[in-house]
């Protein structure tokens, strides 16, 4: 049975919700799935004052955890068109895994959130995907089999590079059912690919 890790950073809960949807899709495909988050770098008093969602159920991952999975799906909100520093800091510590080829051939994918439709979704996905390719991973996006990413009747995230959600400038918009369905679809596709490659 393929093992899938959904690894995320979520300051306000939007990416946490997307991570849960990715995991649902991967489980539907028959994979064993774990959801973990990366450590918070913001001091606790600052995070509380900024209304960060600190009560997240997922355990904090370690770098060595990454080697134990057949697929790793990474999600983080955008920070100025690229991944959040918390995720970047975590992945920067994976040099030892890279050096010994521990992630070569694993399946990878990315998902993100932005405040606006044009707030850097694709560049943020690419900032994650670049890491996955350097690690030697096989990248799986959100293919157009998920046709709802082309909807024009509502504000909706989604790109062929990965599932996305739009939060609104004040963060009040939660992932829509269409966006969650995209995350589930991508999670399922990644798990199916991992099962094909790794059994």
UniProtKB/Swiss-Prot annotation:
Record's keyword terms, sorted: Flavoprotein, FMN, NAD, NADP, Nucleotide-binding, Oxidoreductase
Classification via Gene3D superfamilies: 3.40.50.360
One of the Pfam families matching this protein, by short name: FMN_red
Keyword NADP tagged: yes
Catalysed conversion reaction: a quinone + NADH + H(+) = a quinol + NAD(+); a quinone + NADPH + H(+) = a quinol + NADP(+)
EC code: 1.6.5.2
GO cellular component, one term: membrane
One of the record's GO molecular function terms: NADP binding
Cofactor(s), by name: FMN
Annotated FMN binding sites: 10-15, 78-80, 113-119, 134
Details of cofactor binding: Binds 1 FMN per monomer.
Residues involved in NAD(+) binding: 12
Binding locations of substrate: 98
Chain ranges of the Flavodoxin-like domain: 4-190
Protein family according to the UniProt entry: Belongs to the WrbA family.
Protein name per the record: NAD(P)H dehydrogenase (quinone)
Organism the protein comes from: Rhodopseudomonas palustris (strain TIE-1)
Lineage of the organism: Bacteria, Pseudomonadati, Pseudomonadota, Alphaproteobacteria, Hyphomicrobiales
